[in-house]
Design a protein with these regions (language model features):
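Bacterial N-terminal signal peptides
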Residues: 8-19
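Bacterial N-terminal signal peptides that target proteins for export
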Residues: 1-8
Length: 109
């Protein structure tokens, strides 16, 4: 009887942890992070960013395509020196979101 209880608790913990991992994405399905639409003109800063970003090669929260003009779709970013929609800081640890640079099909995976 005791083994059944331990097994049931183990299965319950597994489902709780896997559900928390699925809900861990900081980017909403429509491409927003804390009310910031993740498209448009972006300025890279060294301190006090709107979003801290880590570049990864797998399992991103957002796929980003850099463009020169008209960054209208979610995941299309135009890097600028002024007139930005939001600011980012590239970090190696403790990011707000994880991004992957792509050449096509930007957006939320």
């Amino acid at each position: 009887m005791r083994k059944w209880i331990q097994l049931a608790l183990l299965v319950l913990c597994f489902f709780c942890l896997s559900g928390a991992a699925l809900a861990a994405s900081a980017v909403t399905p429509d491409g927003y992070f804390n009310g910031i639409r993740l498209a448009g003109k972006v300025r890279v800063v060294d301190s006090f960013p709107d979003i801290r970003v880590q570049v990864v090669s797998a399992f991103p929260d957002l796929r980003v395509q850099t463009v020169d003009y008209f960054p209208d779709d979610i995941g299309q970013w135009q890097f600028v020196d002024y007139g930005e929609d939001f600011t980012v800081q590239f970090v190696n640890s403790f990011p707000d979101i994880r991004i992957q640079f792509v050449n096509s099909f930007p957006g939320v995976p």
